[in-house]
């Protein structure tokens, strides 16, 4: 066999590898690409809002329909390919097997197939920018009938089809990934790793996997039905006699007796669990990192497990609070409101548990505070700030005014986008040694944290005031004869735009830190954070777990911690 052929075969083995760590890193790089594109799109949106006549380099002046296309693609990229792909597919592939003492995922080929399908999904989505008409303009929720009729506007023909195909592929890939994740947790735990010895990150991935099976199956079905309406003239979502751009849709046996409400129910049955699919892994990571850096056991481990399960169950039951103004039965609105208030109870319990860990560990926590701990504080801050507006939007009478305003944009960007992003940063800084064998630069990391924290609050907190003033989201501009009542908000929106540019610029520090640390970072050693969970164990080939995952403040003159697989405390 020639040397060239050997190199080619090695290259293909690497390309189509089933190694879980390699696939996990590839997922994270895919998410990094998606977040870079999504961030650029959001900056174009912000610039257009305050300067609609500005001609951007390479893009020219963005028309109103172009702004709506940016909204659609930004939301889709961030929700699906960043906040779902990175914490679930990426870090679960990278870390999950090691945390339960397994050598690999239960279904490694399925893991690889899921990654390549996700990559295909992203490619199909981005292709929508380059087809006639461009990307769809109906928002990342794509409500019918606007999304069901090709003549409804620019981007609603081929671009809309590509969006639906992309999301269908993504749903299928996510379901495969969830099956693999759940099978791994159930069948690959090492000796002694009982359910109540699993780290809380594993519990969060377990519940997240179940949510994915339910939520993405429903979204996949909804996508198929919408494609059927568009190309087979079925009538699932388009009412009889609908007029779109002057065209009466009254053809015989087509688009008869459909209802956009059906799409709302199907989409939001996926959409609200998606919030917890994005946030639950962050909750598990927060508990683990707080225990690690305060050098104290998790406060109420069983309670934390119970709240995770409670959130998973109730996360499937509260989708209707997105539909208070849709015309659904008011009694149903009351029921959804009560259940939404109820789901705040376990979330509040988690916050109280985290605060108790900080209080108990105030004398024993690591000094100086490492970067992963800072970003964990950031997650906690955004989760509380965004969560406080949740009960407001859960009231039908208040939501009637605030629905579809910037108040909602501020709410979900704080509790989902910023909380999720800061948790992802914490995870990267914490687990970077497992990927490269090196530590990330602490000074750059701290600058990255503080600039990002300031930029995030300066960007999203003022949006609450824009929403309270009545500004709807998705408006392409604030000036002109149609926007007279919004012109007074232009200074506020200008400040938000400047803050968004500042926040995006701060992320260059993170990219620089990644590039520098991967090559020249300080060697990490086998367990740089002196952690107790198995991903930091030096050998998992004959691993046997003999204790829980958070044995810190261990009463010994040798060490203040003991790993799950260690019979005695480790020598320092």
Question: What is the meaning of each model-derived region?
Answer:
Residues 2-572:
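Membrane-embedded and interfacial regions of multi-pass energy-transducing membrane proteins
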């Amino acid at each position: 066999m020639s040397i060239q052929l050997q190199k080619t075969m090695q290259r293909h083995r690497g390309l189509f590898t089933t190694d879980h760590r390699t696939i996990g890193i590839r997922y994270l790089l895919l998410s990094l690409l998606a977040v870079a594109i999504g961030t650029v799109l959001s900056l174009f949106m912000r610039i257009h809002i305050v300067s609609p006549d500005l001609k951007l380099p390479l893009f020219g002046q963005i028309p109103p329909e172009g702004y709506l296309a940016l909204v659609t693609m930004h939301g889709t990229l961030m929700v699906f390919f960043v906040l779902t792909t990175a914490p679930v597919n990426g870090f679960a592939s990278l870390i999950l097997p090691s945390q339960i003492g397994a050598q690999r995922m239960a279904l490694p080929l399925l893991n690889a197939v899921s990654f390549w399908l996700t990559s295909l999904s992203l490619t199909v989505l981005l292709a929508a920018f380059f087809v006639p008409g461009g990307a769809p303009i109906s928002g990342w929720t794509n409500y019918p009938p606007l999304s069901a009729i090709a003549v409804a506007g620019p981007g609603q023909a081929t671009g809309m089809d590509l969006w639906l195909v992309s999301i269908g592929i993504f749903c299928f890939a996510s379901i495969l990934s969830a099956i693999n994740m759940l099978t791994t947790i159930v069948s690959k735990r090492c000796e002694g790793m009982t359910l109540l010895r699993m780290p809380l990150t594993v519990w969060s991935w377990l519940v997240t996997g179940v949510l994915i099976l339910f939520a993405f199956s429903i979204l996949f079905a909804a996508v198929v039905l919408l494609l059927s309406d568009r190309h087979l003239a079925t009538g699932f979502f388009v009412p009889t006699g609908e007029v779109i751009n002057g065209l009466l849709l009254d053809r015989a046996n087509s688009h008869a007796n459909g209802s956009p409400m059906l799409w709302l129910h199907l989409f939001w049955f996926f959409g609200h669990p998606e919030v917890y699919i994005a946030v639950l892994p962050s909750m598990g990571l927060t508990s683990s990192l707080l225990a690690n850096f305060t050098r104290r056991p998790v406060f109420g481990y069983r309670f934390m497990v119970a709240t995770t399960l409670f959130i998973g169950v109730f996360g499937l039951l509260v989708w209707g609070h997105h539909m208070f103004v849709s015309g659904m039965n008011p009694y149903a609105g009351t029921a959804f409101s009560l259940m939404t208030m109820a789901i705040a109870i376990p979330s509040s319990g988690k916050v109280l548990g985290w605060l108790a860990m900080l209080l108990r560990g105030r004398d024993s926590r690591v000094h100086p505070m490492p970067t992963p701990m800072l970003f964990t504080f950031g997650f906690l801050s955004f989760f509380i700030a965004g969560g406080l507006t949740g009960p407001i939007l859960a009231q039908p009478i208040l939501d009637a005014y605030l629905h579809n305003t910037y108040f909602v944009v501020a709410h979900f960007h704080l509790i989902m986008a910023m909380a999720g992003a800061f948790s992802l940063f914490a995870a990267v800084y914490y687990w970077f040694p497992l990927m490269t064998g090196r530590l990330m630069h602490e000074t750059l990391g701290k600058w990255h944290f503080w600039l990002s924290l300031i930029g995030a609050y300066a960007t999203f907190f003022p949006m609450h005031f824009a929403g309270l003033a009545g500004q709807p989201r998705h408006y392409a501009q604030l000036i002109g004869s149609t926007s007279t009542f919004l012109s007074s908000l232009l200074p506020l929106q200008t400040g938000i735009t400047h803050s968004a540019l500042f926040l995006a610029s701060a992320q260059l520090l993170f990219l620089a830190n990644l590039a520098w640390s991967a090559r020249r970072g300080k060697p990490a050693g086998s367990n740089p954070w002196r952690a107790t969970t198995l991903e930091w164990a030096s050998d998992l080939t004959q691993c046997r777990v003999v204790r829980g995952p958070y044995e810190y403040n261990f009463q010994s003159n040798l060490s203040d911690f003991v790993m799950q697989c260690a019979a005695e405390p480790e020598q320092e």
